Design a protein with these regions (language model features):
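Active-site-adjacent loops and short helices of periplasmic peptidoglycan-processing enzymes
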Residues: 36-187, 191-200
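Glycine-centered signal
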Residues: 2-3, 29, 33
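N-terminal secretory signal peptides that target proteins for export/translocation
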Residues: 1-13
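Bacterial N-terminal signal peptides
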Residues: 18-30
Length: 310
């Protein structure tokens, strides 16, 4: 067999691209002693209270700021809720309808205005869209209801999943994130994002900038436009695999994203406790620019090494 006798050429740039996530981790983490002696990479200035950037699937931390501080995660909680729904409610037909009721409305109390009207019916797929795109707080309680679970059981499933993922500082008391007791750390929530991204339907929803859902009542239908709260969707140079925003007065502005870079490597980012609505996206842009600059420097050096045979 040719692979048993022919030694691969490790000087080609193809190998550098194949192993880029590992090289990036070494390059940015400062574990390359020679690089550390000659030049210290300028780290991005992040305004969020805590943040982390992790290479996927290696798991190497490329950047962190107070990443182990336990903080409320607001509507980032809906990622865990979606995971529990997908895993524990497989019997629920996504095309089937659920009629919004007063309990669904009650569990959304204290959140933003909902577009989902009581006594109207919505498909479970449309409820997922409302929850993950617009972050509607009536959608997850409705999905929980269709799954046949009460609040206490659903929250218990969320916490069991957190334990399964090895998250020691993550806990939930309800599905939306309105409670200050829905908490985690930036470091741990990268694992929640990665777990949610295992479901293609969730990724597809989170990659959608705008959509239309349908409300049904007594044979009548009404179309409702749903926009995504992630302003990075459609931005040039930003390839979103999955993302979720969150906000409460206590948690402040939060954001998590799984982002594919230009060389097809992937990074997971979490930003918690940003004071301004757009600060979390500004933090992403600063990190994204930093990664791109480091990437360009690395491949320029790699190409020079190949050309000069070093």
């Amino acid at each position: 067999m040719p692979y048993a006798t022919k030694k691969p050429d490790i000087t080609g740039t193809w190998l550098a691209h194949a192993l880029w996530p590992l090289f990036l981790a070494v390059f940015l983490a400062g574990s390359c002693e020679a690089f550390a002696k000659t030049q210290e990479p300028k780290m991005p200035k992040i305004a969020s209270a805590s943040a982390i950037v992790v290479s996927v699937p290696i798991g190497q931390v490329l950047f962190e700021k107070s990443a182990d501080d336990v903080r409320p995660v607001a509507s980032l909680s809906k990622l865990m809720s979606a995971i529990v729904f997908m895993e524990s409610c497989k019997q629920v037909d996504l095309s089937a309808l659920h009629q919004m009721n007063s309990e669904n409305r009650f569990l959304a109390k204290g959140g933003d205005h909902s577009r989902l009207t009581t006594n109207w019916s919505y498909s479970h797929l449309d409820l997922l869209k409302a929850a993950l795109m617009r972050s509607d707080n009536r959608a997850m309680p409705a999905l929980m209801d269709s799954c046949g679970m009460r609040l206490q059981e659903f929250a218990m499933r969320m916490n069991m999943k957190a334990q399964e993922l090895g998250l020691k500082n993550t806990s939930f008391s309800e599905p939306n994130g309105l409670s200050q007791y829905n908490v985690s750390t930036a470091r741990e929530y990268t694992k929640v994002m990665l777990e949610a991204s295992r479901f293609p339907i969730l990724n597809q929803i989170m990659q959608t900038k705008k959509d239309v859902i349908t409300a049904w009542k007594n044979g009548r239908s009404q179309k409702i436009s749903v926009g995504n709260t992630d302003v990075l969707l459609g931005r040039k140079g930003v390839d979103v695999i999955a993302a979720k925003t969150g906000y409460t007065d206590i948690a402040r502005y939060c954001f998590t994203i799984l982002n594919r870079l230009v060389d097809n490597s992937t990074v997971a980012m979490v930003f918690l406790g940003a004071e301004g609505k757009h600060t979390r996206f500004g933090d992403f842009s600063r990190v994204h620019k930093w990664l791109s600059e480091r990437m360009a420097e690395y491949f320029a050096d790699e190409q020079s090494a190949v050309e000069f045979g070093t």
